[in-house]
A protein has these predicted regions:
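Positively charged, helix-rich recognition surfaces that bind polyanionic ligands
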Residues: 3, 148-151, 163-384
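Stable alpha-helical structural segments in soluble proteins, enriched in small hydrophobic residues
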Residues: 33, 78, 82-93, 367-379, ...
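Ordered, soluble secondary-structure elements with a strong preference for glycine-centered loop motifs
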Residues: 13, 17-20, 77-80, 200, ...
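Acidic carboxylate diad motif detector
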Residues: 52-166
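Well-ordered beta-strand positions in beta-sheet-rich domains
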Residues: 4-8, 137, 157, 187
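Long, hydrophobic, amphipathic alpha-helical segments used as structural scaffolds
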Residues: 34-41, 90, 94-101, 175
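Gly/serine-rich nucleotide phosphate-binding loop at the start of the catalytic core
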Residues: 1-79
Length: 384
């Protein structure tokens, strides 16, 4: 089984320059590949695959344009992967899975430095450092997090990324499959919401982390820093003495706050999933939420986005598969909140403001807990 491990690294000043150059080259090549195929289409020529583009770039374009020879200074595997990502984006567009590929702008796009194991000396890992091709040994912040080479684990591939002035490495490692877990407990249903993050049918409720005092304080601070950044831009437009270096410093402050808030939410999701999986249920049932539709409501869009429902589903799916737990997904139109768990009657006039479910049979229960109980016993579902 292949598993990804992501942690922060502490590269030297020289390694940082190398990372910046490689990521910049990857972004340039990705944009160049999109622009070249766009030009071919406008001229009525055939689409150029990633392999043909690399041959054309190395044997035709670069010899005629020596000013772009700096492309060859970057790690070749990372550049190749950038072209492959461009081809994947085009394939998704051709298959009507996504929109037309967009160019990646400097500072606003998530571009990574890809690396792969070519020989036994590449991609070795020790407790406190990891060997990355073209960078050498790089120190790891969280010592012992990535399985080491001495323990028999092999890094197949990975990538280096940057976010808010911090550097991360993600390594793909082959680990042995876990033995079938003893799933002696009954299945559970999970209802996701905005008032509380998750309500489980076993009675456990996970609160909305966005309502905590810590996150509210950080969000207020973020508003102040964003206002300060906006004023600097306005002063620059008016021609007043605002240094561009100060704008970059303020922008980094805003990025770090965004990153910190995002990390708190992600950490809460990870801990919630770990606690749910530790109960060893025979199966877990969730509902197929229409998040994109919920985001269209201007009154709820911000609250929905901050809950990160999709990330919860993806990570729960991976953790369930790792522990041999069946993850069931109920139909999107299954009325889990409107069905009485006691008699099965559907209460069609239930409003979103009704937090207590009251049935004519005398059954009274919290709306979200009633939905979790219904999800636990749903008969029609898909296996995630």
């Amino acid at each position: 089984m292949l598993k990804s491990f992501r942690t922060e690294i502490h590269p030297t000043a020289e390694q940082k320059v190398r990372i910046h150059k490689t990521i910049g080259t990857c972004r340039f090549i990705y944009n160049f590949y999109l622009a070249h195929n766009k030009e071919l289409y406008q001229n009525g020529e055939k689409f150029m695959s990633s392999s043909k583009f690399r041959v054309w770039l190395n044997h035709e374009y670069l010899p005629q344009h020596p000013e772009y020879l700096w492309i060859k200074e970057a790690y070749s595997k990372a550049v190749t992967q950038a072209v492959n990502h461009g081809q994947t984006a085009f394939k998704k567009f051709f298959n009507h899975e996504s929109a037309f590929p967009k160019f990646k702008k400097k500072g606003r796009s998530d571009v990574k430095m890809y690396f792969v194991k070519n020989n036994p000396k590449d991609c070795r890992c020790e407790r406190h450092r990891v060997n990355i091709p073209s960078l050498g040994w790089v120190r790891i912040k969280e010592k012992g997090y990535i399985p080491t080479t001495k323990e028999g684990y092999i890094i197949k591939s990975g990538h280096v990324s940057m976010k808010a002035g911090r550097y991360y490495v993600s390594a793909l490692i082959e680990i042995p499959d876990n033995k079938t877990a003893d799933l002696s407990n009954e299945g559970i249903g999970i209802d996701l919401g905005l008032k509380d993050f998750a309500i489980v049918s076993n009675g456990k409720t996970y609160k909305n982390i966005n309502k905590s005092a810590r996150l509210k304080k950080l969000e207020k601070r973020l508003v102040r820093e964003q206002r300060c950044l906006s004023r600097k831009y306005e002063n620059l437009k008016k021609g007043e003495s605002t240094q561009r270096a100060n704008i970059q410093k303020q922008k980094l402050k805003v990025q770090k706050l965004h990153h910190k808030i995002d990390n708190i939410r992600t950490d809460y999701i990870n801990k919630t999933i770990a606690e749910i999986v530790k109960t060893k249920p025979s199966y877990i049932t969730i509902e197929d939420l229409n998040v994109s539709g919920m985001m269209k409501n201007k009154h709820l869009s911000r609250a929905v986005a901050s809950q990160k429902f999709y990330e919860f589903r993806i990570k729960l799916k991976a953790k369930s598969r790792e522990n041999g737990i069946e993850l069931r997904v109920a139909d999107r139109w299954y009325p889990s909140s409107k069905i009485c768990h006691c008699c099965g009657m559907i209460k069609k006039d239930l409003k979103l403001s009704d937090r207590i479910f009251r049935c004519h049979c005398g059954y009274v229960e919290d709306r979200d807990f009633n939905a979790a109980l219904n999800l636990r016993g749903v008969k029609t579902y898909k296996i995630a």
